[in-house]
């Protein structure tokens, strides 16, 4: 195979894999592989994925197709590309024009639906202007993963698609980075420096509640603007309750169970194994009324001390001024 194409999915350790690949060019080269620095953003090929889709905001300069063709023409090199944008947002037939079937092995990690939706919701609140509840988010963004998987299998064939379960028990050494290295022909995990991998924790608790409230005062473009999402990643380091899993009630878990029952069955038939869903999810309350005022004041204090960008938008919120 000339290409190893890692397509996600999101919330399956993709940032850790991409950071590891970007930091280990010598280990990859030892086995004849390259992780190209071709318009990488946050160590990933997101802009390339959007350009393949034809997204007007991809931002790649004119002539990128020719440069990509010249880059990958080297007969003595094989190439790893990675972007979770590919799995759900880019038609596989378009991807195949650049990474042809027969020359490409596609790698996809999927996680259980409950963990996926909890993590995706927290990420959406952090990085966009989402204001809806978790329950509403589950119903609005009900996207059967098996449906997308079928599209990739139709273009590349089942034998060329490596489907992996994102669970500690299923991963080599309980680590998605080591698991992925094992899929790169000729590579040995012992040659890789894994110290620089990114953890990318989800925001939680009252920080999640605050960002969701703040989102009502930002446009979609404003909420996505750098460095606002990263600012909330830094705020998550202030308290344990600002990061990790947020609590989900029995009703919320039951909603996820019902909503994705057919998809879960289809993926299990495809060979994935999922643990039974719990009755409820223990985690940080969002909001936590007992510490809400204290936490809001902490967020405001740190934001002012470090002159965070989101302060411009928080100024539109009357309650912010009274803290």
Predicted segments with their positions:
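Anion-recognition interface
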Residues: 1-323
């Amino acid at each position: 195979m000339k290409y190893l194409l890692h397509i996600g999915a999101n919330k399956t350790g993709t940032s850790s894999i991409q950071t590891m690949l970007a930091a280990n060019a010598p280990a990859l080269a030892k086995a004849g592989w390259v992780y190209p620095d071709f318009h990488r953003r946050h160590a990933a090929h997101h802009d390339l994925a959007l350009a393949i889709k034809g997204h007007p905001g991809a931002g790649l300069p004119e002539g990128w197709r020719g440069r990509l063709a010249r880059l990958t023409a080297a007969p003595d090199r094989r190439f790893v590309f990675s972007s979770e944008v590919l799995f759900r947002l880019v038609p596989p037939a378009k991807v195949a024009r650049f990474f042809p079937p027969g020359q490409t092995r596609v790698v996809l990690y999927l996680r259980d639906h409950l963990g996926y939706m909890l993590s995706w919701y927290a990420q959406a609140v952090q990085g966009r202007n989402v204001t809806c509840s978790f329950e509403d988010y589950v119903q609005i963004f009900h996207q059967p993963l098996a449906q997308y998987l079928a599209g990739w299998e139709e273009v590349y064939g089942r034998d060329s698609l490596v489907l992996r379960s994102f669970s500690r028990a299923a991963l080599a050494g309980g680590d998605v980075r080591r698991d992925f290295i094992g899929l790169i022909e000729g590579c040995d995990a012992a040659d890789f420096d894994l110290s620089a991998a990114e953890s990318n924790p989800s925001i939680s608790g009252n920080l999640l509640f605050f960002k969701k409230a703040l989102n009502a005062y930002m446009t979609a473009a404003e909420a996505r603007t750098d460095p606002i999402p990263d600012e909330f990643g830094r705020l998550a380091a202030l308290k344990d309750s600002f990061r990790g899993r947020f609590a989900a009630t029995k009703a919320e878990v039951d909603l996820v169970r019902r909503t994705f029952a057919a998809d879960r069955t289809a993926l299990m038939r495809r060979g994935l194994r999922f643990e039974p869903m719990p009755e409820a999810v223990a985690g940080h309350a969002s909001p936590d009324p007992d510490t809400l005022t204290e936490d809001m004041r902490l967020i405001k204090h740190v934001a002012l001390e470090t002159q965070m960008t989101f302060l411009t938008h928080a100024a539109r919120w009357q309650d912010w001024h009274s803290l």
